[in-house]
């Protein structure tokens, strides 16, 4: 195992407080260029990233789309950028003919988006940025705010910035609790 990869995985934290320091669209492009290597169903690459830098749009998402969860509202307001991770619906699991390859249905597209979101977060950490993956939001309201097409579904909100501080790692379960060998 490459030591740098191990360090990145172990060192990444959910960052909820950011320095008052901007990040640029170019910096976000670098993160997404790395995240684009995330595996996906038959390499369908269904995940999309919407970088929100516009303060009014970011405020609209924070104030109207996170179901009144004040903690997340504050995080989004304070983050220099917000990435809305989406996926193209109806592509994962399907063959070019339209037939399903498995009985997993549309659950797999969410799995693909999750892998991509984690890859995005690890890439951001490697490049010196902090992220937190948020799941409390009204996906329809976020989609409306971004004027997404019908085939694009919101998977996660990911504030991005420079960490104010690196929090300690929360306790982890023992491997013996996580792994069953048969």
Where are these regions (language model features)?
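Glycine/small-residue-rich phosphate/adenosyl-binding loop
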Residues: 43-113
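A structural motif
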Residues: 28-36
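Small-aliphatic-rich amphipathic alpha-helix that forms the alpha element of a beta-alpha
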Residues: 35, 83, 89, 99-145
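Short, Lys/Arg-enriched N-terminal segments with co-localized hydrophobic residues
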Residues: 1-2
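A glycine-rich helix N-cap at a beta->alpha junction
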Residues: 72-79, 147-169
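C-terminal helix-cap and adjacent tail motif
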Residues: 5-15, 20, 91, 156-182
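A short beta-loop-alpha structural element at the N-terminal edge
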Residues: 21-26
């Amino acid at each position: 195992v490459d030591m740098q990869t191990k360090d990145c995985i172990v060192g990444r934290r959910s960052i909820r407080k950011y320095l008052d320091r901007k990040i640029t669209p170019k910096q976000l492009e670098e993160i997404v260029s790395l995240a684009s290597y995330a595996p996906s169903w038959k390499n369908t690459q269904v995940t999309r990233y919407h970088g929100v830098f516009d303060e009014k749009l970011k405020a609209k998402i924070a104030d109207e789309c996170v179901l009144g969860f004040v903690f997340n509202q504050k995080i989004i307001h304070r983050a220099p950028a917000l990435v809305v991770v989406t996926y193209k619906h109806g592509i994962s699991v399907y063959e070019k003919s339209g037939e399903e390859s498995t009985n997993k249905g549309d659950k797999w597209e969410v799995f693909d988006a999750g892998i991509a979101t984690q890859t995005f977060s690890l890439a951001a950490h490697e490049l010196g940025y902090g992220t937190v993956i948020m799941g409390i939001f009204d996906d329809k309201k976020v989609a409306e705010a971004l004027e997404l097409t019908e085939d694009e579904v919101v998977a996660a909100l990911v504030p991005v910035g420079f960490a104010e501080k690196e929090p300690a790692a929360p306790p982890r379960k023992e491997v013996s609790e996580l792994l069953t060998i048969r």
